[in-house]
Amino acid sequence: MTIPLYEVLILASILFAMGLACVVAWRANVIMMLIGIEIMLNAVMLTFVGGSAHWGIAEGQVFSLMIMALTSAEVSLALAMVAYLHRRKQSVDTDDFSSMKG
């Protein structure tokens, strides 16, 4: 039993829209922006895997693994910066990141 590609694309579009809404609605909070970005990247991975399964090629799954590696590095760096900012300013607002100029 296979899932049609259009259903995968509809689900990925809904997920991407939810992630985009999270990023736009919570622009002041860095953690909520990270969650939204992760949801959007998961939608992209779902699209790659769905296309890969539909056309019978493995490149979509390889790209999904690369996206997973990229997002894990992105999250670890972003959370380290958020932890540093929270210790220093007692806040996780995006406006406070301008004080971290090196």
From Swiss-Prot:
Recorded superkingdom: Bacteria
Topology term for the membrane: Multi-pass membrane protein
GO biological process: ATP synthesis coupled electron transport
Keywords: Cell inner membrane, Cell membrane, Membrane, NAD, Quinone, Translocase, Transmembrane, Transmembrane helix, Transport, Ubiquinone
Aminoacyl-tRNA synthetase is among the record's keywords: no
Primary role: NDH-1 shuttles electrons from NADH, via FMN and iron-sulfur (Fe-S) centers, to quinones in the respiratory chain. The immediate electron acceptor for the enzyme in this species is believed to be ubiquinone. Couples the redox reaction to proton translocation (for every two electrons transferred, four hydrogen ions are translocated across the cytoplasmic membrane), and thus conserves the redox energy in a proton gradient.
Entry similarity comment: Belongs to the complex I subunit 4L family.
Name of the featured protein: NADH-quinone oxidoreductase subunit K 1
Organism, as annotated: Citrifermentans bemidjiense (strain ATCC BAA-1014 / DSM 16622 / JCM 12645 / Bem)
